[in-house]
A protein has these predicted regions:
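Active-site beta-loop-alpha junctions enriched in small/polar residues
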Residues: 1-3, 33-35, 80-82, 113-117, ...
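Active-site acidic/histidine proton-transfer and metal-coordination neighborhood
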Residues: 11-108, 117
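Conserved, mostly hydrophobic/aromatic
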Residues: 30, 111, 136, 175
Length: 207
């Protein structure tokens, strides 16, 4: 994973090979997490949500521009789940998902379960971004201590996410159902894919 925001630096050793593998116009999109894994020389070994403020936004914009220069295209930026509210934030999460694409000129990989889990865990109302959503991820999680939701990609897609998908889907978005373990019978996974496809089809036909 390449660091693109909170440290103010990018990782050329990651982006260089990616540029060599990039097959040009045949690739619809590539993505990176809107997160950091190290700062000040300290590696934390986990995706961490950066402070949602103008300092982070400026560093992110610089690094996205550098990624665009090296690879030729900018990544879609994926929102992450967090169990800790990022300190020093001046934007709400939903505001952040609107200002990041405008500041960087790139699009969002909107992970609906990450946003759903954060909203449940921190008690905010979801306002879905309407601009520059280039890809959508669906996944599931589980309830942990104190009623919080852990985004573990090991459970079925919650019903609420299909309603969110219907609100944000358009004809161009790529939708991916993620599952990283605790696999059910394959037919159940296919049913989630079919449900997502039908949700998008119905939503787009009503525009």
């Amino acid at each position: 994973m390449a660091d693109l925001d909170a440290t103010g630096t990018h990782e050329g050793e990651v982006l260089g090979p990616r540029a060599r593998l990039e097959p040009g116009d045949e690739t619809r999109a590539w993505s990176e997490h809107l997160a950091f894994v190290r700062a000040g020389g300290i590696e934390i070994g986990h995706l961490a949500a950066p402070p949602r403020n103008d300092e982070t936004l400026s560093a992110l914009a610089r690094n996205v521009n550098e990624a665009r220069r090296i690879v030729g295209t900018a990544p879609l930026l994926e929102n992450v789940a967090t169990l800790v509210e990022p300190p020093c934030s001046t934007y709400s999460e939903c505001e952040w998902l609107r200002v990041v694409p405008r500041a960087t000129g790139t699009g969002l990989l909107l992970d609906l379960h990450n946003l759903y889990a954060n909203a449940r865990n921190f008690g905010f109302d979801i306002v879905l971004p309407r601009e520059r959503v280039g890809m959508i991820h669906l996944a599931g999680g589980r309830t942990i201590a104190h009623g919080r939701i852990l985004d573990d990609h090991r459970h079925a897609v919650p019903e609420a996410l299909y309603a969110m998908l219907a609100d944000v889907a358009d004809d161009d978005a790529i939708v991916i159902v993620e599952r990283d373990g605790n696999y059910p019978p394959f037919e159940e996974l296919l049913a989630e894919v079919r449900r997502a496809r039908e949700t998008c089809r119905t939503a787009c036909s009503s525009f």
